[in-house]
A protein has these predicted regions:
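C-terminal substrate-recognition "lid" of short-chain dehydrogenase/reductases
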Residues: 1, 13, 92-126
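A short helix-coil junction within the Rossmann-fold of NAD(P)-dependent oxidoreductases
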Residues: 3-15
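Active-site helix of classical SDR
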Residues: 1, 37, 45
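Short, flexible catalytic-loop segment of classical short-chain dehydrogenase/reductase
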Residues: 25, 42, 63-74
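Alpha-helical segment proximal to the catalytic Tyr-Lys
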Residues: 6, 50-51, 112
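Residue(s) in the substrate-gating loop at a strand-loop-helix junction
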Residues: 21
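Short, small/polar-rich loop/turn modules that mediate ligand/substrate recognition or access, typified
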Residues: 53, 58, 114-116
Length: 128
């Protein structure tokens, strides 16, 4: 991020989208080190957004929840995935496309007044 910020500062604009996690906003038993690392990404995102906002640089983070990826398939047995989905207000797991659409919006002019945001893409999981 440091080198990107130098280039963007010279240009007077830019967008940085960090990849955090739903666990940047909440906790999960047994995931202490992962949670700590993702809280750090969230803090870095917010702090850097404040420092570089006047330079025309927007910095946000996407906080995906449980997304249907190879990692989820490897780490969560199939029979547990349905139960996991049922614990989401939207009653499903996310898709990589859900995350990509959020990134596209954050990178677009439609979000021109959005910076320092930890943008949840988690089907409401962190809302409960």
């Amino acid at each position: 991020m440091r080198e990107s910020l130098k280039i963007m500062s010279s240009a007077g604009s830019g967008h940085i989208i960090n990849m955090a996690s739903a666990l940047s906003k909440t906790t999960f038993p047994g995931a202490g080190l992962y949670v700590a690392s993702k809280f750090a990404v969230g803090g870095l995102t917010r702090n850097t957004a404040v420092e570089y906002g006047q330079s025309g640089i927007r910095i946000n983070a996407i906080c995906p929840g449980f997304i249907k990826t190879p990692l989820l398939r490897e780490s969560v047995p199939e029979e547990d995935r349905a139960h996991l989905a049922s614990r989401h207000p939207m009653n499903r797991l996310g898709t990589p496309e859900d995350v990509a659409k959020a990134a596209m919006w954050l990178a677009s002019d439609a979000s021109s007044f959005v910076t320092g945001m930890l943008f949840s893409v988690d089907g409401g999981w962190t809302a409960i």
